[in-house]
UniProtKB/Swiss-Prot annotation:
Gene from which this protein is expressed: HBB
Species this chain originates from: Sus scrofa (Pig)
Residue numbers of N-acetylvaline PTMs: V2
Descriptive protein name: Hemoglobin subunit beta
One GO term describing the cellular component: haptoglobin-hemoglobin complex
Taxonomic placement: Eukaryota, Metazoa, Chordata, Craniata, Vertebrata
Known function: Involved in oxygen transport from the lung to the various peripheral tissues.
Expression (tissue specificity): Red blood cells.
């Protein structure tokens, strides 16, 4: 559960309507893989991840990033039940993929960076604070199975 004021929730959901999930998802996952290269081990089947240009132009990275951000978008519809919304993904990432739950926090922070870059002045400090709450809540929900 994410505790947002009415103003924060309005800002998050309002700005989310301006987000191109396809583009932001690919950029966010790509940046995660470049900035935190140890995360690439989960994506060895994606082909060439040898440098930033290869990662950012990789169609499999873009496609999976889109899928990730679509799930994040679904979570925004269920801010009061993030653990329930992400329960199956938490189980998958814990039991089958063995992803370090710290990676969820890292991805959340990268999503915030990409949103700030793309939304410019609309992504003011108050909006950033609200989004940080949301990505922290999603990361916590995804890590829930690990506890």
């Amino acid at each position: 559960m994410v505790h947002l004021s009415a103003e924060e929730k309005e800002a998050v959901l309002g700005l989310w309507g301006k987000v191109n999930v396809d583009e932001v998802g690919g950029e966010a996952l790509g940046r995660l893989l470049v900035v935190y290269p140890w995360t690439q081990r989960f994506f060895e089947s994606f082909g060439d991840l040898s440098n930033a240009d290869a990662v950012m132009g990789n169609p499999k990275v873009k496609a999976h990033g889109k899928k990730v951000l679509q799930s994040f978008s679904d979570g925004l519809k269920h801010l009061d039940n993030l653990k329930g919304t992400f329960a199956k993904l938490s189980e998958l990432h814990c039991d089958q993929l063995h992803v370090d739950p710290e990676n969820f926090r890292l991805l959340g922070n990268v999503i915030v960076v990409v949103l700030a870059r793309r939304l410019g002045h609309d992504f003011n400090p108050n909006v950033q604070a609200a989004f940080q709450k949301v990505v922290a809540g999603v990361a916590n929900a995804l890590a829930h199975k690990y506890h």
